[in-house]
Amino acid sequence: MAQANLSEILFKPKFKHPETSTLVRHAHCNQAMNVHSALDGDTTSHWYRMINRLIWTWRGVDPLEIEEVLSRIACSKAEHSDNELLDTVVGYRNGNWIYEWAHQGMQWQQKAMEEADPMNAGQYWLNAANLYSIAGYPHLKGDELAEQVEVLSNRAYEEAAKHLPYTLKELSFDISDGGTLTGFLHMPTIGSAPFPTVLMCGGLDTLQSDYHRLFRDYLAPKGIAMLTIDLPSVGASSKWKLTQDTSFLHQQVLQALPNIPWIDHLRVSVFGFRFGANVAVRLGYLEPQRVRAVACLGPIVHHLLCNADSQRKLPDMYMDVMASRLGMADAADEILRAEMNRYSLKTQGLLGRRCQTPMLAGFWENDPFSPKEEAKLICSSSADGKLLPISSTPLYDNFHRALLQTSQWLEDKMR
């Protein structure tokens, strides 16, 4: 089916779709929590979503384009589900978050389809994929429009790979409950298969296609492949609920890697962002024979999951994401917080025990989601731990340096 026709079919004008901020029914406090986080962005007065300029720019979205779309959303006079929040326009129309970002993505998609130069076309497809992904953000369960735009993001991501100098393979993995899971294997032009491979574990509010930059700029130049798998309840893994066994899907993928001819299953490491670090560190404990090393940035493995004061300071969107992932969209806050406690790797009896898998943990000072103690706990639990402090200013440059250091460390551990 042609891309243009697909978008027309998916997005027939309709005003009865549930608005994103109404999907989780916990007690929204509707007040600015003044949260500033390198990996999650900023809370902004009168916005439901956290505005994540650093990561969106890092993925390749033009900062001016970000402001242009945000201004279109902010100016809308259409009906809102909450008149205090700018990004809550009801229905797929002008001013709606998903509509405006998807509209921007469709412009790049059209440009890609008309472009003759392969490199330019590939970049335009990537631009479209990034914008479609932001349209679906924060990817809450049951968000019909977001689920539709995620289809466009994946299609655009696959189209980009046809034009750019790397190989993308869509892999299917059989899961023990009878389901089939899909992941993307990115292979570099440097070296030859089987490749040393990094298994990517992203955050709770991201898609597996959001980490192309990590592969292109940090792993591919070292001849390292990247395998991406969505966290349970997100994207291609949406049929599975996130449980206390957070590494359930990734562990089965790891166990299947000896059957993948393009991957050197004896040289596999795991990289976790935010809650993805929970999965990554868990794998380091459960699969030490299969995992050469674990790296994580801004890990969420204990503190936020157990500290009630920190949880109370979380923005509404982030609590909604947690509730959505845990399948607790209707639960009272107290019940949700009690359940979150069970996801702590320390509560589960893992962190704090000695682990032979080398682990690197990067942290930002005054990170509201992941304090320095979180990273120190991971490093001190490993027989070969490395603590990586990351300065907050200049934010973009230091994020880049942290990724350079982390990718070099992973390469060294997979030699």
Curated annotation (Swiss-Prot):
Pfam family, one: FrsA-like
Catalyzed reaction equations: a carboxylic ester + H2O = an alcohol + a carboxylate + H(+)
Enzyme Commission code: 3.1.1.1
InterPro entries the UniProt entry points to: AB_hydrolase_fold, FrsA, FrsA-like, FrsA_esterase
SUPFAM superfamilies per the UniProt record, alphabetical: alpha/beta-Hydrolases (SSF53474)
GO MF term set: carboxylesterase activity
Record's keyword annotation contains Nucleus: no
Superkingdom of the source species: Bacteria
Positions of disulphide bridges: none
Record keywords, A-Z: Hydrolase, Serine esterase
Biological role stated in the UniProt entry: Catalyzes the hydrolysis of esters.
Sequence similarity: Belongs to the FrsA family.
Name the UniProt record assigns to this protein: Esterase FrsA
